[in-house]
């Protein structure tokens, strides 16, 4: 590997665990709807609301990369169905999104970012819709690219190419750090970027492809990258 100039980070499940965050955010949204727009919950459960979003991603493949649009549009449908104004959707989403950005960072996230920020240009690519400024991490990153803004999801190599183009970088001196074998490791490889698999659980490499550079903690990155 040539001397590294820049590091791209995945966000969800790399810098924080995302599953519990989404659960808390959805329950906060349900509590809001119960108080302000109760007819929605007379018609739907959390599971049926999730099912609608999944169906919408199938019905609107051109928008499947935009989790914000899918959630807002499904909420608009719920509003119309329950006889409420569509403005309900934006109100409910605002509640969801506030809690969605109240993440609990992994213990190694800030120490690693502080060390790496002093030596490398740092970027982020995420399929999710987290707000680094709201989370308090924007100071570390030169640029963050979300799938909803890029128009595509990882592992599409074009999302990596778009970030590299904006950063004025070639792929050969860039590494991408993430937890997902397909979205992060295979996506980076397809873009010509060196992947680093963040394997916190110590799992076996699950595919027939050669295993990538691997770390069990973000604090291993400074030594790995030299």
Q: At which residue positions do the language-model features occur?
A:
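Asp-based, Mg2+/Mn2+-dependent phosphohydrolase catalytic module
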Residues: 1-7, 19-20, 86-87, 110-114, ...
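N-terminal helical cap/lid subdomain that shapes the substrate entry/recognition surface
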Residues: 2-107
